[in-house]
Regions:
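Long, His/Glu/Asp-enriched segments that create or flank divalent metal/ion-associated functional microenvironments
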Residues: 1-250
Length: 250
């Protein structure tokens, strides 16, 4: 995590709150097979984010435990840390809590928040954060995963796809074992339309960055763009675009 913090100093202002790495609570492991993030409560003086990491289940039989451990590949850690902590969720959500606007502190949309975190996985590839071909490969696997979530989100909630079919699709197209895929699909079923927001948000943010770059010309600075974007908290990307003067008000 310290490597990503060092790089992000060149890309955005760092918030003051630290983040703890803790084991995922047992009541969440059925929905979170790998990792997740919980921001600090807004009105507490002690601002501490939590990066939850789901550990392999020690109660599984040896063969099942080995399959689960294969899903917890060390080469995926770099992109996961970038997504959940710096420059991803922790940086964005804690920065939002420090804003003066109550609306920007409290309201957020998954297209902005999850789009930002997935954008950050790619951003760290652009900065050279991934030091091995395997780390870069898993960043691209994550990108494929989010594209597959679009297919499954739409399929499960509007096309009659069953949970079993969704699990089969994941196992066929991704390096994921069945138990973890089942946990993922349970979450997809519980949160309609949320899962497609990762890919849609990343697409919208990349488009916004290019339009901002074109408007700034030779004066474009990546950190200035990120600081301006983070100043909108988790508001919709369309509102950030309008606020930056790149489009008529939605």
């Amino acid at each position: 995590m310290s490597r990503s913090m060092g790089l992000i100093l060149l890309l955005a202002a760092l918030p003051g709150a630290p983040v703890d790495i803790v084991a995922t609570p047992s009541f969440l492991t059925a929905l979170v097979p790998f990792a997740s993030y919980e921001p600090p409560p807004i009105y507490l003086d002690a601002q501490q984010g939590r990066f939850y990491v789901t550990e392999p289940d020690p109660s599984l039989p040896p063969e099942a435990a080995a399959r689960q451990r294969r899903g917890h590949c060390r080469h995926s850690i770099a992109a996961m840390v970038a997504h959940e902590t710096y420059p991803g969720h922790h940086l964005q959500l804690v920065t939002a809590q420090e804003l003066g606007s109550e609306v920007r502190r409290h309201l957020w949309t998954p297209v902005m928040v999850e789009g930002w975190a997935l954008y950050c996985e790619q951003l760290m590839a652009e900065t050279g954060y991934y030091t091995t071909p395997e780390q870069r490969l898993f960043q691209l696997v994550n990108l494929l995963w989010r594209a597959i979530r679009v297919v499954l989100d739409v399929g499960l909630h509007t096309r009659g796809m069953t949970a079993r079919e969704a699990v089969d699709y994941m196992v066929e197209h991704l390096p994921i074992e069945r138990r973890s895929a089942e946990a993922e699909v349970r979450r997809y079923c519980a949160w309609p339309t949320y899962q497609l927001c990762y890919a849609v948000g990343r697409r919208d943010l990349l488009s916004l960055r290019e339009d901002y770059r074109a408007a700034a010309g030779d004066g474009f600075e990546l950190r200035r763009f990120h600081d301006a974007l983070l100043g909108y908290g988790g508001l919709p990307v369309s509102l950030a675009r309008w606020g930056m003067g790149l489009e008529e008000r939605p």
